[in-house]
Design a protein with these regions (language model features):
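Short, charged surface segments at domain edges that flank catalytic/cofactor-binding sites
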Residues: 1-16, 73-93, 97
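Histidine-centered nuclease catalytic patch
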Residues: 16-47, 56-68
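Glycine-rich loops and low-complexity Gly/Arg-rich segments
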Residues: 41, 51-54, 72-75
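Long, charge-rich boundary regions
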Residues: 50-68, 80-101
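General helical structural elements
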Residues: 6-7, 101, 112
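N-terminal hydrophobic or amphipathic segments with adjacent small-residue motifs
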Residues: 5, 31-32, 51
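C-terminal, charged low-complexity interaction regions
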Residues: 108-114
């Protein structure tokens, strides 16, 4: 999926802050990181503005959303195209964080354990 296609699909709107930006101020973010089994398909990609992407850093989407309630509301409203399994994983991690439970390892999609 081309980044321009992701931006157009998301109407050039950051899924975290809800603001519209010109394409040169946007980046593509993986909901399920590639290191955790995520892929480069449109169902795993969202549009993020530069400031939100910097604030998120290397944290998981759920860790970022847990720390930023307004971003969590925007994500839930704007990330409707994200595959349900990825949305469930984000919501499960948010629920675990809210309960103070330790995070369990995320299963890698499409990989085998050695």
């Amino acid at each position: 999926v081309r980044r321009e296609d992701v931006f157009a699909r998301d109407a050039y709107q950051c899924v975290y802050c809800g603001q519209v930006f010109p394409p040169e101020e946007l980046s593509v973010d993986h909901v399920q990181p590639r290191v955790r089994g995520g892929d480069r398909s449109g169902g795993n990609l969202v549009t993020a503005c530069g400031p939100c992407n910097v604030r998120k850093g290397h944290r998981s989407v759920a860790a970022f959303l847990a720390a930023e309630p307004e971003s969590r509301r925007n994500f839930r409203r704007l990330a409707r195209h994200v595959w349900p399994r990825h949305l469930r994983a984000v919501e499960e991690e948010l629920a675990q964080r809210a309960r103070g439970a330790p995070r369990r390892p995320v299963d890698r999609v499409g990989t085998t354990e050695d």
